[in-house]
Amino acid sequence: MTLPEIKDFMPKDIAKDIIKEKQIRPDRDQYFMLSAVIAATRASCIKFNSGAVIAKNKRIIASGYNGNPPGVPSCHEQGFCNKDAAGVDRSSKGSGHCLATHAEANAIVQNHEQNLQGATMYCLHFPCNECAKLIASSGIKEVVYLKMYREQVPKAELIFNHAKIKFRQMEMHYDQMLKKIEQVMKSTKE
């Protein structure tokens, strides 16, 4: 079926827009990363939102965001950050005040009985050292990220190199992705 034939099955204004305006379709990397961004919108941390998606065989098999374990009140629920309340520098690690689980760790935990050998993790930030250990132990073989984590994470890179895990920074064209979301939302109007 050709595009002109397809337009007969769509509302006229939408069909016209699709024909005159180039339809944007994300490639797989963009799709999986956009899914990680969407996962981050569920983060329960009030200071730092992060999301992760694990893909294997061209499918999402797990996702996660930074948030507290079940039953543990989050900063979002409390209305304050535990680190701020304790007067701890936000960038300090291992103080024990932050009770959230990182997005990468949550994605691994949320994977239900799926073998992660050879999978790819898409995350907003380059993983910290602790998450790098979990990623290596899980069998994930590639990590794609948008930004470097706030701190230097040379141990994470070392872990990935020893475990032969590929890692690469991805460039995301936000304007194109927002335009695609807008196209999708327009197509849902009646």
Across the structure, where does each feature detected by a protein language model lie?
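Zinc-dependent deaminase catalytic domain
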Residues: M1-E190
